[in-house]
Swiss-Prot record:
Family note: Belongs to the UPF0301 (AlgH) family.
Cellular component annotations (GO), alphabetically ordered: cytosol
Identification of the protein by name: UPF0301 protein PputW619_0469
NCBIfam families: PRK00228.1-1
Amino acid sequence: MKTLAPSYLKHQFLIAMPHMADPNFAQTLTYIVEHNANGAMGLVVNRPQELNLADILEQLRPDEEPPASTLQVPIYQGGPVQTDRGFVLHSSECSYQATVELQGLSLSTSQDVLFAIAEGVGPQKSLITLGYAGWEAGQLEAELADNAWLNCPFDPDIIFGLASEQRLGAAAASLGINLSLLTSQAGHA
């Protein structure tokens, strides 16, 4: 008997189904950074906080005035795990102290990327989050089987080219789906 290799969702989007009850993930679009037999990690990319980069820089360097441009750089709620830890998803033309390459995209977790963005010498495209979404081994697969999520191919234009409130709908539309027309009820033929 042939066994199938597991299918993992690294470098894809997760679209929260309209009936998602968990307030951490209701109406979210999540980029999957890693997914393997040990579990999954993702970053919610459509939920801005009231914080901006200037607020973060004031905490990191209290003796320095952040550049005015940093007031316009939003900070996103990346997920409910380690909400005091920063993650920067960005274009790959720059690398920093703690950078991981993700198939044409990079993820940095060191402060130097924040300072580079503030100084105008950082990556051309970036999204900054505090916290991340984490799933134990088999947990995400179970949630997918329960129809809590849809997955779709990653598209950098959705993260970097659209306003945060447009991202979820655009990801669903890439599958030809209008989320407002979906129901949580499953039928059987």
